[in-house]
From Swiss-Prot:
It catalyses: L-seryl-[protein] + ATP = O-phospho-L-seryl-[protein] + ADP + H(+); L-threonyl-[protein] + ATP = O-phospho-L-threonyl-[protein] + ADP + H(+). ATP binds at I355, G356, S357, G358, S359, F360, G361, T362, V363, K375. It comes from Mus musculus. The gene is Raf1. The lineage of its organism: Eukaryota, Metazoa, Chordata, Craniata, Vertebrata. PANTHER family: RAF PROTO-ONCOGENE SERINE_THREONINE-PROTEIN KINASE, SERINE/THREONINE-PROTEIN KINASE TNNI3K-RELATED. It is an enzyme of class 2 (transferase). A zinc finger (Phorbol-ester/DAG-type) spans 138-184. This is RAF proto-oncogene serine/threonine-protein kinase. Residues 205-265, 281-335 are annotated as: Disordered.
Amino acid sequence: MEHIQGAWKTISNGFGLKDAVFDGSSCISPTIVQQFGYQRRASDDGKLTDSSKTSNTIRVFLPNKQRTVVNVRNGMSLHDCLMKALKVRGLQPECCAVFRLLQEHKGKKARLDWNTDAASLIGEELQVDFLDHVPLTTHNFARKTFLKLAFCDICQKFLLNGFRCQTCGYKFHEHCSTKVPTMCVDWSNIRQLLLFPNSTVGDSGVPAPPSFPMRRMRESVSRMPASSQHRYSTPHAFTFNTSSPSSEGSLSQRQRSTSTPNVHMVSTTLHVDSRMIEDAIRSHSESASPSALSSSPNNLSPTGWSQPKTPVPAQRERAPGSGTQEKNKIRPRGQRDSSYYWEIEASEVMLSTRIGSGSFGTVYKGKWHGDVAVKILKVVDPTPEQLQAFRNEVAVLRKTRHVNILLFMGYMTKDNLAIVTQWCEGSSLYKHLHVQETKFQMFQLIDIARQTAQGMDYLHAKNIIHRDMKSNNIFLHEGLTVKIGDFGLATVKSRWSGSQQVEQPTGSVLWMAPEVIRMQDDNPFSFQSDVYSYGIVLYELMAGELPYAHINNRDQIIFMVGRGYASPDLSRLYKNCPKAMKRLVADCVKKVKEERPLFPQILSSIELLQHSLPKINRSASEPSLHRAAHTEDINACTLTTSPRLPVF
């Protein structure tokens, strides 16, 4: 028996019994706190002889399949006799109930009071069980890599790879596992104790012991780690895992090493809503009247105030639509959609200059941690379907990172839908070519075409169709670095009929593909339609003008291009335009979309053309400019010091 007690002390101390969440006067759970019913063996019957009565001892069956024999002295109560035996096992009498096993009725027991005189029970067999309403549960550890900044709740040092309890949120390093508190707080049961402190146990009709004082509850909450307090300060409902083995289960395997937490446990679900716990503590401290508690309805929480104690099946069947219904509810803090953090409050952005307006919105220069471009979209009173579709597209746009793509910085949904992007100091390609008439050299024009194809190839690799590719949406940033903007956003670039998204011709007429103008398909936008728009941009680069400049009627252009009667005049291209570039322009603006190349092929063609262009290499005989001064000095020195040769 001393060996068992000594081993149990080692296990308890190894798991940091002194660092438990509750103080010493409250309930402390052992390492394994499932309510394993003690199974008496047939060989145990009849072992109790008259010698036990003469030796003043009582045999006691304890939780977790343990047993002990205690000595009884006159004047001692059950509480005094069993205190030491329970304490060395990490238990407290306030958390347990004691029963006397009836010898005449096998399997039946009668509950005793802890103040009962122990002398009257000499020679009897007693059993100690956990109380049903006591919030005892075990940690549910899972190995986790913390991608966001996190710190160990034990040593308060940086934590990258470690463990985290799925129930209470306790996180720690593997080498700190010996200091983890043994008790994991079951918040649903604590909530019941706070709201119904005078509740009784209805199974046997025997009143339950007095509930824990409110002071202990406050202390237990205040002694939680900082990260756990922050976790339970939000008003959301959490779903965590906790082990729930059968009460008749047995400890068939040895205790695991204390250096590694047990991360393999059967899981069921528990719901936690800590705002109600805080409200209950506050209301209880202000007024302890029953009316203050009864005024709160039972259906304020998605999880409910009270949960009946029903056996949890090993595998719970889920309704077909339960998954989607749960996702539509308030998201837990740890599982919140990451696009939430990309939403910007309208009050944080300061708009200054109106840059211009287009088919789908107005662009402003603004201030939000620096210069940004804010595009307020032309969507009035968006429906919930439009708002959700807009957020879905934003979730795709926020993942774009490329040197030739405008950096997406966030979005706004209050009052108006708006997107916030990187600010480009340079002008658009349209302004350079047709307003300022900047004179680019041919190799510069080819490099602009290459960068544009490179950015579009990246967007298509992300399954993003631009839908409005034109020279107005191509910006030259800090010299000749191409930045493509206003991509995606099919929600804004479509017409909505009720809750249904209906495609319509979008974009500028000169850059619209023939199939987009005709709108014969439900969704005419494709990678090939973007290629056609890119071909018109190539025409602008290589011709220095817009296509169909001789046609002044917009409707005529729409009719002729849609019918296939008109195409860009390739004879207007520059005379020094390479033949490979002329062929590429002709391929991109073909009337049949299946005949157009895709951007990987376009990009490789332009790169091959760049490598084939003749380059002017510096002459090897030309002196370096930074060495010219030294050369002059040497020549002067040579001329002045050369000796005169005698003349014969």
